[in-house]
C-alpha cells in the first residue's frame, strides 16, 4: 500500500463523518425521539369547550372525565410516547375520582416534569384538530399563544392545523372533535 497516491475529495457538509467519540456526541444533538398522540371526545349541549387551554364560547361542551381539552390530551400522549413513559391513562386514569374535571394544563405540567427528569426537551410539535365546528382558523393565533405559554416554548415551534371530516362519521355530524399530534424531543443542549 505504500505506492498509493493520496488525493483530496470534495466533501459535503451534510455528510457528517464520525472519526472520534466527540463526533458521536455532536451528532446526538441532531437525533430526536418522536411520539404520536390522538384524542377524540363527543360533544353535548353546554356552554363552551377548551382547546389548548383556550376557552371557546359555543353552545356545547366536551364529554369527558377531565376538562376535555382534546388538544392538550393529544399533545400529552405524544410527549409521553416519545419519552418512553407510557400514555395519559397510566398517570391520569378516568377511573380515578381525583381526576374528575382535572385542568389539562396540569397534565402537561406533569409531562414537562417527566421530560426534565429525563433531560429531554421538546424540539417541535405539530397538531391537527379535526372538527366541523368550531372553525379553528379565526381562533388559531389565540390557541397558539396559549399553547406557547403552557408548553413554555416559542410559537414558531408549534404547528397548528385544522381540517374537517367532510361531514363523514361522528365528527362530520358535529357530534365529536378529535386531535392528532406529533412531538419531536431531543436531549437538552
Feature locations, PLM:
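Conserved alpha/beta core of the MobA/IspD/sugar-nucleotide pyrophosphorylase nucleotidyltransferase superfamily
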Residues: 1-35
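Glycine-rich phosphate/pyrophosphate-binding beta-alpha loops
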Residues: 17, 165-166
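RNase III-family endoribonuclease catalytic core
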Residues: 22, 29-141, 151
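Generic structural marker for isolated residues within well-ordered, non-membrane alpha-helices
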Residues: 144
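Short acidic capping loops at alpha-helix termini that bridge into adjacent secondary structure
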Residues: 154-157
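C-terminal edge-of-domain segments
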Residues: 171-189
Amino acid at each position: 500500500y505504500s505506492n498509493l497516491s493520496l488525493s483530496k475529495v470534495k466533501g459535503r457538509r451534510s455528510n457528517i463523518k464520525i472519526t472520534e467519540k466527540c463526533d458521536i456526541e455532536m451528532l446526538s444533538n441532531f437525533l430526536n425521539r418522536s411520539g404520536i398522540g390522538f384524542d377524540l371526545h363527543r360533544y353535548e349541549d353546554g356552554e363552551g369547550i377548551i382547546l389548548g387551554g383556550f376557552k371557546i364560547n359555543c353552545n356545547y361542551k366536551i364529554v369527558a372525565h377531565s376538562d376535555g381539552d382534546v388538544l392538550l390530551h393529544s399533545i400529552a400522549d405524544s410527549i409521553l410516547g416519545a419519552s418512553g413513559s407510557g400514555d395519559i391513562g397510566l398517570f391520569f386514569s378516568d377511573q380515578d375520582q381525583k381526576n374528575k374535571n382535572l385542568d389539562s394544563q396540569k397534565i402537561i405540567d406533569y409531562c414537562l416534569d417527566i421530560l426534565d427528569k429525563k433531560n429531554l426537551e421538546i424540539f417541535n410539535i405539530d397538531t391537527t384538530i379535526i372538527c366541523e365546528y368550531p372553525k379553528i382558523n379565526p381562533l388559531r393565533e389565540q390557541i397558539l399563544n396559549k399553547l406557547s405559554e403552557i408548553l413554555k416554548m416559542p410559537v414558531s415551534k408549534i404547528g397548528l392545523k385544522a381540517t374537517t371530516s367532510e361531514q363523514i362519521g361522528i365528527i362530520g355530524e358535529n357530534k365529536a372533535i378529535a386531535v392528532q399530534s406529533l412531538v419531536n424531543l431531543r436531549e437538552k443542549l
